[in-house]
Amino acid sequence: MSERAWGIVFALIGILAFSFRPILIKLSYAAHPVSPVTLLFLRMTLSLPFFLAIAWWLRNQEPRLTARDWAGIAGLGFLGYYAASFLDFVGLQWVGAGVGRLILYLFPTLVLLLSFLFLKKVPTWREVVALLVSYAGIVLVVSNQVAGENRLFALGAAFVFASALCYAGYLVAGSQMVKRVGSMRFTAYSTVVATVPAVLQFILLEPLSALDLPTAVWGYAIVLATVCTVLPLFLQAEALNRIGANQFAIIGAIGPVSVAVTSALGLDEPFTWIQALGGALVIFGVLLVSLRRSP
């Protein structure tokens, strides 16, 4: 397969693995009154050994990093891995997994906007049409979950939208950094850096007894740290390197569909024929932007 084809495959697998994250977060909240601060601490520290091992393995890789490179890695790690994750964890206390993914997966539009504003990249008509089709599908997938939310829904939605904005900024800026530093090295270093504020936040805000959690929560945290963090981060970094931020972001619209299905199975969130129709629209939009025309 071509580099672009591999990029699409990596993006799809990474996004599907990553989409299980809200399910595990909601299951953790349901199993025990664990705080977002503690859950994020567990996710970051349990995944840290993997990223440290990879960072050590790649320590002599060229090119050598400059002070400016390190500053960029630190800033992007804070923005894309710490801030975006924490805001999402907080928001998911008050919104359902499906609704949360609808808001979070607004990030493709934010990516296209930021790319236009800062990188002067004008979206093609195919990207615009794909966005319209995909987001029409997303609205159908989760529309019936929006009704009947309590007053905290707006607050949770605001946190998740802020998470989407942070992630979009990471994708746009990270696409340039990845090309210089390398996707694996960039991901490992930036995630290690992002663990620092997560640990400091836990130390400052939570007692040590907050780690006295049921076995189920620890199990969810381990899966969250490995299958839903380590694996998708590297797959998505490789995809970003091969297909760019705009197409990666639009392919990411398939995430809410997988969340709607898994939410229906694991969290008893509704999944109707209207949502199935929406899923079909999302997939069509993804194919529209992912498949090249025949010459």
Name these PLM-found stretches:
Residues 6-16, 42, 62-87, 155-163, ...:
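Loop-to-transmembrane-helix transition segments
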Residues 23-33, 90-93, 142-153, 202-216, ...:
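Membrane-interface helix termini and inter-helical loops of multi-pass transporters
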Residues 51, 114, 123-145, 198, ...:
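Hydrophobic transmembrane alpha-helices of multi-pass small-molecule transport proteins
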